[in-house]
């Protein structure tokens, strides 16, 4: 579950991480009031207006701007709220901005130069261990750093049996080139950041940039946070942070009815039981020269009602030109699934206007094929994996 920057900063602050202070606003009037409050509390006279969407790269998309007075706060907020923000991490349509964060200006002059770093904590799925990824090249262009100078990005793996050790935090601070008070501040920052990551059951905490201020303080200027969905049952206070408006509406609807659905950009809808078979089916579609429109795992109870619900979910995507149903009958019987497909097709009537290709293997697969072939419905059946792909290709080539 992704959350907004301001929510991520709230979590960080609760674990003792120094953050760039800010107040969220839903409209320009609230934005001006937030700026006035910040001036009272922090003394700042310049402000940063930051679009709150679940995507990185907001600065490049025009979603982060500096305001030097209250009038500019109002004007910039009016520009950003309601805009379709397009960044390297959004679709071509972008994301609509519903709120902004009015933050204090922390790039003030002082005895030393400011520096920006990149630090994230996440799970290394290859080793099964948490790790801290860090770089001296923090800021908007971290993607460019990763692509062209990957040697500037380092990582520190954490042994789960002992957790983050003090020497590891010191090593990171040393590798970032810090000394004196800034070194001590960074060690404390890393320790608190890791505690926030563990304590909130997060799957990622990305801070970009981490700022060394001109008076050698270390603070989080941004926060991109993902909370593990599977841990929300024990993190109810974070579950309330979900912003449905930021999520794909089809995915939200699918989740409400218990379907595991992920929207993609292709034209071939997929209805499969089991995540592994679903991914293999998507690969097959790509090998056939097409792109999958979704990942959809119907699970082990593919009755008529569930199949019909899955059909309706898939067809909400206007880009879908064909649907491939690929079911392996282990516990679930193939004939039951086939009857569900036929019944769903009858119930939906003219709602289904795209070719349907069904491949059923496993328990009662022969009976299932007969059911489909004798149904009188314009449903194509296949036995082999490649045969199903060929039928998809033939259907879309007409």
UniProtKB/Swiss-Prot annotation:
The keyword Protein biosynthesis does not apply. Its cofactor is Mg(2+). It catalyses: succinate + ATP + CoA = succinyl-CoA + ADP + phosphate; GTP + succinate + CoA = succinyl-CoA + GDP + phosphate. Residues 9-253 form the ATP-grasp domain. GO terms for cellular component: cytosol; succinate-CoA ligase complex. Signal peptide: none annotated. Gene3D superfamilies: ATP-grasp fold, A domain, ATP-grasp fold, B domain, Succinyl-CoA synthetase domains. Pathway: Carbohydrate metabolism; tricarboxylic acid cycle; succinate from succinyl-CoA (ligase route): step 1/1. Its EC number is 6.2.1.5. GO terms for molecular function: ATP binding; magnesium ion binding; succinate-CoA ligase (ADP-forming) activity; succinate-CoA ligase (GDP-forming) activity. Keywords: ATP-binding, Ligase, Magnesium, Metal-binding, Nucleotide-binding, Tricarboxylic acid cycle. Mg(2+) binds at residues 208, 222. Substrate binds at residues 273, 330-332. PROSITE patterns: ATP_GRASP. ATP binds at residues 50, 57-59, 106, 116. Pfam families: ATP-grasp_2, Ligase_CoA. One of its GO terms (biological process) is succinyl-CoA metabolic process. Heterotetramer of two alpha and two beta subunits. PANTHER family: SUCCINATE--COA LIGASE [GDP-FORMING] SUBUNIT BETA, MITOCHONDRIAL, SUCCINYL-COA SYNTHETASE BETA CHAIN. Belongs to the succinate/malate CoA ligase beta subunit family. This is Succinate--CoA ligase [ADP-forming] subunit beta. The gene is sucC.
